[in-house]
Amino acid sequence: MKMGKEKKAAVDGPIYDARTLGTPKMLILGVQHLFAMFGATVLVPILTGLSVSATLLFAGLATLFMHLVTGKKVPVFLGSSFAFLGGYFGVVASGAELGLSQAEALPYACVGVACAGLLYLILALICKAFGSKNVMRFFPPVVTGPIIIAIGLILAPSAINNCSTNWWIALVAIVVVIVCNIWGKGMIKIVPILMGVLASYLVAAITGNVDFSGVKDAAWIGLPVAMQNTVFGLFSSGSVNTGLLVSSIIMIVPIAFATMMEHVGDISAISGPIEKNLIEDPGLHRTLIGDGIGTTIAALFGAPANTTYGENTGVLILTKVYDPKVVRIAAYFAILLSFCPKFAALITAMPAATIGGVSIILYGMISAVGVRNMVENHTDFQKSRNVIVAAVILGLALGVNFSAAGAISFAIGNVNIALSGLAIASIVGIVLNAILPGKRDEYMPNEENSGSLGKF
């Protein structure tokens, strides 16, 4: 009788070892965890033109690598990052001016993302050497907040363009996402993006607005990575455009400053519910290494940048199952699905209006997260220096991006370099905050809320 009471208490309270639930329940929890991450993870490759199969494969592999690096102590899933969308779009636009197709230009963007991932390793080394707190003071919310706001605003026009293909289908997605997020209960509240996509996709299919021919022709089993879509394929082609390559790196790498702040916020947020200080053990330097190398490897093989997911925290709070093994099960399922081209074709067939509908909310939420980042960290806009830093970042990021040229271009020798507004704003903002007189604000990660750019 006593054993029965102990077992019931264990189920009702936090669970740190999911094996006590039995294998079937562990598998179900793993599938649930994957679906919580699924909506945003597959939406990024759909928006950018990258491979859905490669995305699932490297989301799973990156998650497993993160767990390996952190000693299997951190219950985190790595999925696709929305923060780099502007970088992908910018490189594709630059490639189009040179006569390159989207498929030909995307590997150049992947080079930039791979380099951005390496920046995580540099920060990890610095954190290990000098301590996380000393490093984060150079990236306070008055810098990262406006950058995040600009990311969302720059992406917003593409969402409207997608919605314009069929506003009724887009509205279904928007309404369902809002209803699930505001009035949903349990797991429904955790996966509003997935619910919005499924509902809108279903309505589009019923009304004849979906072309399933690609799904019919796709094989059930196949390799998730095509060599011609990878960075290796780019360099083996023998026709690399050096100017576009350098521009891609300069355009995309500064975005990592914002996503690294996102990483810190998410790791802090996970620490709260599981009642373990993950910043100290296994250490921020280890989680940064896992995220950074995961992003670099994914990009080299033509998959999007990875990021820690805020939905991850939501699922942990909902289920009270804090065992990292459950997250690893979700990773295994993601890898398994990546070898099914028919599944990827079903995702790719999704109407543009469905994508646009959920993107309106997602892109707006990115900007809202930037605002929240500053509010939660008590950024003082009574200080003139803070107003100037934020104003310059927003002015440069939006002004350059929406100017006639869309970038600031210059030549170094025979190499033409184009800097996006976001890249310029990030660099100038960090420098301004460092040199302007007055007391600088510090980054204070909130343990209850994360600033994820890869989540809803």
Predicted regions and their residues:
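Membrane-embedded helical hairpins/re-entrant loop segments and their flanking transmembrane helices
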Residues: I15-P24, I46-H67, M251-P324, K455
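Interfacial segments of multi-pass membrane proteins
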Residues: F89-G95, N181, N312-V327, F333-S338
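Juxtamembrane interface elements at the cytosolic ends of transmembrane helices
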Residues: A9-V11, F38-T41, A173-C180, V191, ...
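Membrane-embedded alpha-helical modules
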Residues: A105-S213, A331-E447
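N-terminal signal-anchor module of multipass membrane proteins
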Residues: M1-L78, A83-A103
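Hydrophobic, membrane-embedded alpha-helices of multi-pass small-molecule transporters
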Residues: P24-A40, I169-A173, V191-P192, P224-D266, ...
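Intrinsically disordered, low-complexity non-transmembrane regions of multi-pass membrane transporters
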Residues: M1-I28, F212-G238, G272-I279, A434-F456
